[in-house]
């Protein structure tokens, strides 16, 4: 199973940009992990989108999953129990969930270069050895640990 966390800044609201970015990233991943090919609909049975359920990138990720009939796993933050720490606790749970002996974990983070919550998710993903893609929608660049490329 491939667990793909789609997360990011709450002010990110460009679905078309998210979709285009995900297609580009999945094309790169297809060669290495055989999860998808050029046509995203070709093989999605071994993939799940993981969402923190926040507005912005998380919600757009769920919209993407619905459009392509991809299974989802939701991790809403428990603000009533954990207060201001809820988002950080939720991020940790998602990162740990995405990587098991039976799954490959991937993070696609849509970041403005400022959001502390998104930076926290990126740091957790790297700490937990998830394949990490950071889409800086302000500079139109996608970065992973091996390369830097443009969305457009």
Each PLM stretch: what is its role?
Residues 3, 12-152:
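Acidic/glycine-enriched connector segments
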């Amino acid at each position: 199973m491939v667990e793909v966390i789609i997360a990011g800044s709450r002010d990110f609201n460009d679905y078309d940009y998210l979709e285009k970015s995900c297609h580009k990233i999945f094309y790169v991943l297809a060669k290495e992990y055989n999860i998808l090919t050029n046509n995203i609909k070709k093989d999605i049975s071994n993939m799940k989108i993981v969402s923190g359920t926040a507005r912005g990138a998380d919600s757009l990720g769920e919209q993407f999953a619905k459009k392509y009939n991809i299974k989802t796993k939701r991790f809403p933050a428990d603000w009533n129990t954990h207060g201001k720490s809820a988002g950080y606790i939720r991020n940790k749970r998602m990162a740990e969930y995405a990587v098991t002996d039976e799954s490959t974990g991937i993070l696609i983070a849509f970041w403005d270069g400022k959001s502390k919550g998104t930076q926290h998710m990126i740091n957790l993903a790297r700490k937990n050895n998830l394949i990490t893609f950071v889409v800086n929608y302000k500079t139109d660049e996608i970065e992973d640990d091996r390369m830097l490329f443009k969305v457009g």
